[in-house]
């Protein structure tokens, strides 16, 4: 457990919250913008370094506030440029953040919880159970740490991080308020100024919160599907028993429609040998998604000890992909990145106890992040 200082952590405050904070200490609201730029654009955590802030205000801030991100436990860099950070949060648990570069694009995969309560059968985090929600500061702190690590400050100039995906450890919609606040900071010009099309939230299917999402934010949405029928999905993703497929897809369509633009849902589908990789599964998937504008990301499973699952053959994956292509869907197969630093999916057993095993996580979310700039709407199933 990391000891709390009792001070207000400014790192996770949205612009509105920051303005209220300055009101509360008797200062002008414009100070909020000044301080936010120092924190997020320049990566500053020392009030004395904020040179356009008066000395009196700096002293006041030091007495009642702080800028504190998660503690970096380790940082590793792969031969392919993938980076992985293990960070410790206030609860004492460790979570992971992974950066995947590709050309001019750099995607950061961010965690939202330590542990997970959803108990997906191919996910070791689910077997470990839920530990804690990350605070807004701990969620946005992963972006802050990565940005500082690259030395890409100010954040709006020659940025290394062009896309963020909430696909790390945990179910983002079960930490709704903190994740929403952090995503607002990702997109705010006083934060990281990332386009709404380049911020993606991935969910296993918490239907009420999908319906709530459009009232609070406009970001891209990805659905962890993993099965084309309720019977199989009930086994793989138990939350499906509460929110079955048609209910779930209806909520996703409502959300996408609410955006008022030609946006498509990303479908994530972890491929498990002899479980969900057969021709009949592809046929079911084609029928299931016929009314859902979407692109599909097939994710070959990376086995881990005692998982009970195996990766399908390349032929089985290609056959599945071809069937979906022939039906008119835009389909990609995830490419594994960062294996030499154990940043590839399923490679971190024993290093961090509370880590995700959702097999779609961490790497090769590059396909997702490319949607806005490389996937024309005409190439998607409508």
UniProtKB/Swiss-Prot annotation:
Its main location: cytoplasm. GO terms for cellular component: cytoplasm. One of its GO terms (biological process) is tRNA methylation. Residues 102-342 form the Radical SAM core domain. [4Fe-4S] cluster binds at residues 116, 120, 123. It is an enzyme of class 2 (transferase). Transmembrane segments: none annotated. Reaction proceeds by a ping-pong mechanism involving intermediate methylation of a conserved cysteine residue. Specifically methylates position 2 of adenine 2503 in 23S rRNA and position 2 of adenine 37 in tRNAs. m2A2503 modification seems to play a crucial role in the proofreading step occurring at the peptidyl transferase center and thus would serve to optimize ribosomal fidelity. This is Dual-specificity RNA methyltransferase RlmN. It comes from Pseudomonas savastanoi pv. phaseolicola (strain 1448A / Race 6) (Pseudomonas syringae pv. phaseolicola (strain 1448A / Race 6)). The gene is rlmN.
């Amino acid at each position: 457990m990391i000891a709390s200082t009792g001070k207000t952590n400014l790192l996770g405050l949205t612009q509105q919250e920051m303005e209220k904070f300055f009101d509360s200490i008797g200062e002008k609201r414009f100070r909020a913008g000044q301080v936010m730029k120092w924190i997020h654009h320049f990566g500053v955590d020392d009030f004395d370094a904020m040179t356009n802030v008066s000395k009196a205000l700096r002293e006041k801030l030091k007495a009642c506030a702080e800028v504190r991100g998660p503690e970096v436990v380790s940082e590793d860099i792969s031969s392919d440029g993938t980076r992985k950070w293990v960070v410790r949060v206030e609860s004492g648990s460790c979570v992971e953040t992974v950066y995947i570069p590709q050309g001019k694009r750099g995607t950061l995969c961010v965690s939202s919880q330590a542990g997970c309560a959803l108990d997906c059968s191919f996910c070791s985090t689910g077997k470990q159970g839920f530990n804690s929600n990350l605070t807004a500061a701990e969620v946005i702190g992963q972006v802050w740490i990565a940005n500082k690590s690259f030395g890409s400050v100010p954040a709006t100039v020659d940025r290394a991080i062009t896309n963020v995906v909430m696909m790390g450890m945990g179910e983002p919609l079960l930490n709704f308020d903190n994740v929403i606040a952090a995503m607002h900071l990702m997109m705010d010009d006083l934060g990281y100024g990332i386009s709404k099309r380049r911020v993606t939230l991935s969910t296993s299917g918490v239907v009420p919160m999908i319906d709530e999402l459009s009232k609070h934010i406009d970001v891209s949405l990805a659905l962890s599907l993993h099965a084309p029928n309720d019977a199989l999905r009930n086994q793989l993703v138990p939350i499906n028993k509460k929110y079955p497929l048609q209910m779930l897809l209806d909520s996703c369509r409502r959300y996408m429609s609410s955006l008022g633009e030609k946006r498509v849902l990303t479908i994530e589908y972890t491929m498990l040998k002899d479980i969900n990789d057969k021709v009949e599964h592809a046929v079911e998937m084609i029928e299931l998604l016929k009314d859902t504008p979407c692109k599909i990301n097939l994710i070959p499973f990376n086995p881990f000890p005692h998982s009970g699952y195996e990766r399908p053959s390349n032929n089985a994956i290609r056959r599945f992909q071809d069937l979906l292509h022939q039906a008119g869907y835009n389909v990609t197969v995830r490419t594994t990145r960062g294996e030499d630093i154990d940043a590839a999916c399923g490679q971190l057993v024993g290093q961090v106890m509370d880590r995700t095993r959702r097999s779609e996580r961490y790497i090769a979310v590059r396909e997702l992040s490319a949607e806005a700039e490389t996937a024309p709407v005409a190439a998607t199933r409508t």
